[in-house]
Amino acid sequence: MNKKIIVPIILIALTSCSNENFISSSSSSSSFVSSSSSVYSISSEINDEYKIVLDEIAGEVNIHQPIQDEFLESPDIDLKSLGINGSKELSLPEAINLSWKSTLPKDKNFDYFLVRIDENNNFTSPLEYKVPIEENNIDIYNLKVGTKYYWNVEAMSNEESITSEIETFITFFNYPRNIFVEGVTNFRDVGGWIIDENTRVRQGLAYRCGRLNTSSSSTLNIEITDNGINTMRNYLNIKSEIDLRLIENNEVGSYEESALGSGINYYQCPMSYDGNILVNNKNMVKNIFDLLSDKTNYPLIYHCNIGTDRTGLITYLLNGLLGVNQEDLFIDYEFSNFGLINGTRSKESIKKTYVKTIDETEGETLSEKISNYLQEIGITSNQIETIKEIFIEKY
């Protein structure tokens, strides 16, 4: 693991150790196996009498909880009227339930069902989940928004297997893509947002979230669970962690290397949280965008304490640079109120600080204003183009 403290003229490298285990499913006995890059040959049924039939998924599948949809459909609604005040964990996505019916030979001992999900019908990079043979469904979290998925189920034994036909479903194109990582609040993909009628921000590259350990603790207390670590490493494939918390007052909570284990780049980019956090952290914002322009750092996470203010600033600058409209940037900022953030946040508060600073910067569009501001603090035009190449995709 590489640890890098990013302060002007300081770069330190350290190493660490690893930890792994599971994502989430409909029961504690179902488990995420891997995000595999193998090519699978799909076995045929033993005969026509024995089969697995997948239940049809009608319409597009929504990843948001109903209370989240209420806000997304009417973003100017008073969140307190929905009971949203940052005191409860409401940031998790809605599970997608996949189910099937099976007729298996009684004289064969099948060990488990293997559920495969992929974005292509060749299953070249499937997500795999083991389900006990006595069960016939699983809850899936963290799929991309606006994406067509292929899936099948295979009953596995040491001797033979029975495989279903391949079916499909589509996730509803409704951002943000919020993520379930056990032990971490306020977790979502930076990607998925619409730029224009032809382009959007690519999903699966950068994630914003809350802390992974207890802040301001004199002893290290890791809050992300083993399940959460496994989700980060083996499902989201995280390579780098950017920590925006302060070091001088131990806001980092004695955290000196990534809790995600060995091989993860850990960058400390301490930012103050008082006043206009853009103006007061110019050098650190420059260093963070240096990291964002390095393709080798992806996929990555960045976070402060609760993943809202300093994390929200970086997200505003990044997605605004890419061309996401300002109203969507405000929606993403206020979506943090669903997390366990011990308070509420309003777009009105940031309009008076860093949003105002950017609005007063030269440029015709928000993207141009942010680009010009970043260049004023030392980011090059080539770095900006690299960031756009990394994140912008056609759809």
Task: Give the predicted meaning of each segment.
Residues I23-S44:
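N-terminal, intrinsically disordered, polar/charged segments of Gram-positive cell-envelope systems
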Residues H303:
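Residues at the beta-strand->loop junction immediately N-terminal to the Walker
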Residues I306, R310-T311:
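Ser/Thr-glycine-rich phosphate-binding loops at phosphate-binding pockets of nucleotides
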Residues M1-N2, A206:
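Intrinsically disordered, low-complexity sequence elements enriched in Ser/Thr/Gly/Pro
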Residues A13-S16:
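C-terminal motif of bacterial Sec signal peptides marking the signal peptidase cleavage site
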Residues N2-I9:
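Sec-dependent signal peptide recognition
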Residues Y40-L300, L313-Y395:
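Cys-dependent protein tyrosine phosphatase-like superfamily
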Residues S18-E20:
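Bacterial signal peptide processing site
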